[in-house]
Amino acid sequence: EALGPAGVIAGTVTCSIARLSAGDIVLEKARGVGIAAGHPLSEQLVAVLDAAGLNAHRYPRAGDMKWSKLLANLPASATAAILDMTPAEVFAHPGLYDLEMRMSHEALAVMAVQGIRPTDLPRTPVRLLAFASRLPAFLARPVLKKAVGGGRGGKMPSFHIDLHAGRKKSE
């Protein structure tokens, strides 16, 4: 609100990073950057970021991009943090897998009511994740366990890292 719509460009980063110490980060997976269209600088920003090798993509609908990022980050994030489990352990447990799928279904239902569509983000197949979450557990669970467990490069979800580091604020 302080900047107003003219001062903000919606965006998302799908790269995976690790914080080694204050001011010291390492890029674990270079996926890309999403920028919402609609701002006078959006096209130029995408071009500059892409020229810098950041695999930038323009998204015509900011809501689709932002909710798709939420959907991509949802699996095994809060559950892993609360229960101090890895994402693979969460998805290996039948009851927790069911809980995760119910959370995904709820997010997809909210998106549908608002006319928001899942969309793939840079090197992040969100539409496939949305599709897989609707498959029977015997088909989807082994695939999602591997994808969610390995999709973070062996790193725990950010919420888990923040919670167990005693941080009072999280992304």
Where are these predicted regions, by residue range?
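Rossmann-fold dinucleotide-binding core
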Residues: 1-69, 74-75, 80, 84
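Charge-dense, low-complexity intrinsically disordered segments
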Residues: 36, 90, 94, 98, ...
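Generic recognition of short, well-ordered alpha-helical interface segments
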Residues: 40, 44, 69, 98-106, ...
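NAD(P)-dependent Rossmann-like dehydrogenase/reductase catalytic/cofactor-binding core
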Residues: 50, 101, 105-171
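Active-site segments that bind and position negatively charged phosphate/pyrophosphate groups
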Residues: 61-66, 83-107, 113, 117, ...
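Active-site/ligand-binding neighborhood in enzyme catalytic cores
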Residues: 68, 72-87, 140-155
